[in-house]
Amino acid sequence: MLKNIRSYFYNLKKYQTPLEKYVFPVILLLFPLIGANAGLDITDTTYSLGNYQYLDTVNQMWLFSTFLSNKAGQLIMMLPGAGTMLGFNIWCSFITSAMALVSYYFLKRFMPGWMIFIGEFIAQALCFSPRGILYNYLTYLFLTMGTIFLIAGLFAIERQNLYLIIAGVFLGMNVMVRFPNLAEASLILIVWFYGRITRDKLTEVLKKTGLCILGYVCGFGVVFLGTCVGYGGPDAYIGGIAELLGMTKGASDYTSGGMLGAILEAYGTSLSHMLIVLPCIVAGVIMFLLLPGRYVWVKKFLYMAGLLVLVRFFFARGVFTRNYYYYDCMFQAAMMFVIVGIIFCTVGSLGILNGSRQEQTLAFTALMLILVTPLGSNNYTFPILNNLFLIAPIILWLFRRLMQRMGDEDWNFPWQSFVTTVIIVLFIQGALFHINFSFYDGADGTPRDARLDIPKVSSMVTTSYNAETLTDLYSALGDNELLEDKVLLFGTVPGLAYIFDLEPAIDTTWPDLDSYYYMNFDSELLGLDTAGETPTVILGKDSPDISSDKSKYDTLMDFIDNHDYNIVFESDRFIVFASK
């Protein structure tokens, strides 16, 4: 099979250099811009943008647990054009471009550019998180940069110490991007792994470890000192992180057990879907071992036909879907790729491929990234899919290395063709997902064919229902002269503060989140009462959080009743209360 692949692509060799030098980088630069104006979600996406805009009002837990990402968002909003949602999205899209391009040029030292491009294209296509949620994308950017400098430091002859310190700086700063990134300190195992396979002296390994720790402390320490200077000492930061660590009392999915259980559940589900593949591969191997060397192309044709039937079966069972407006179109294919990648990385780390020490280290690095990335998140294994910039190209490279190691025997065709099928399906599904997906908005396939006359989001396309209901709400706020008032939002509508430029009256625009304590909410309302403030209250009517946390809802209703609020607008989606 390997000879056939090589001979087929040999004639294209003359195009490889210009493609790798010019075309692929341009595609990786521009591909993330697709969909920058798609969708107008009023939950997570615009919640983050609202936090950047009104950062001075954000409660200390959220401010400090995602400090650098909040400050970065605030800074980006000052850039040309970033005062609109489209402009902000465009600027943030280049973070994804940067991760892909930096990884592309770094990995070209070890593997062909076309292979890296396929991996980077897949990585960009699977980025599901809204581009404005910077505590995700800065996390992946700093993790990617830290890992690259770590590997460069281990492999370098010159400037080794500098690279290791810089690696530590990026990973240390990443804790200030998002506090759970503390788990990334476990990447020091890469240093120890490299020392083990190269038989470095213990003193040399300890020296490299110390340099990484020095950089880590400096990266974290500089930003921490900045918070101390800006917020009157360390107490504010320590208090915010202490509140974060106590958050699990009201949000079970943020406990260590809950997060680990979700990760294992995702792997378990995907493995259960892959069980049918094992007998297919075994049957294929047996078929090629029977009458060896005879009817090879007939056998290959029959096996590929069987793989097409298997893909059709996965579509019929809902493992793969054609709903390119939602995650399930690509999630299981991506998880199959990751699971296969774990196998390849394990094999590569153990040295079974008889590759170089660099190859072993890259394999172990990809394995560590797969294991570490989802830690600290309650989003199953989705963080891995958003952070494949180093992982995907290394998996593809190890796949080719394993093919080379196993040789050209025909019985290898079944497992090789299955992995190739997964890659092709993922490439196609991922590309279609990237082109069509928008976070929440139109996730059921409803066309996004409408725009709003609201200045900040006028360039965004959304569903007709979303556009109509938001326009009606905006008009009602204007008619009642409420657009200049502060606002209290409840019912999974935090993004309204950003969309309508409404300053929050309390320290969050999403008080109905489980992670926001009832005591905090009660205290904020008491503060409004004491100050005699009666902000506009906008209630989302279709929020599941209202029924799940009645205590907050009841407290809000008591506040409304006690301050002579009236309903000035009501639709099937929103209720507006005003005390005027």
Regions found by a protein language model. Give the residues of each.
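Perimembrane helix-loop-helix junctions
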Residues: 4, 184-221, 225
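Short periplasmic/luminal acceptor-recognition loop of GT-C membrane glycosyltransferases, typified by
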Residues: 431-514, 534-546, 572-573, 577
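Short acidic/glycine- and proline-prone juxtamembrane loop motifs at membrane-interface regions
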Residues: 131-140
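Extracytoplasmic catalytic/substrate-binding loops of multi-pass membrane glycan-assembly enzymes
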Residues: 34-51, 60-76, 82-83, 230-235, ...
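Transmembrane-helix motifs of polytopic, lipid-linked glycan transferases
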Residues: 90-112, 287-289
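Membrane-interface alpha helices of multi-pass inner-membrane proteins
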Residues: 126-128, 162-190, 214, 218, ...
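Transmembrane-helix signature of polytopic, membrane-embedded enzymes
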Residues: 103-125, 162
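Short hydrophobic alpha-helices at membrane interfaces in multi-pass membrane enzymes
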Residues: 149-173, 202-211, 359-366
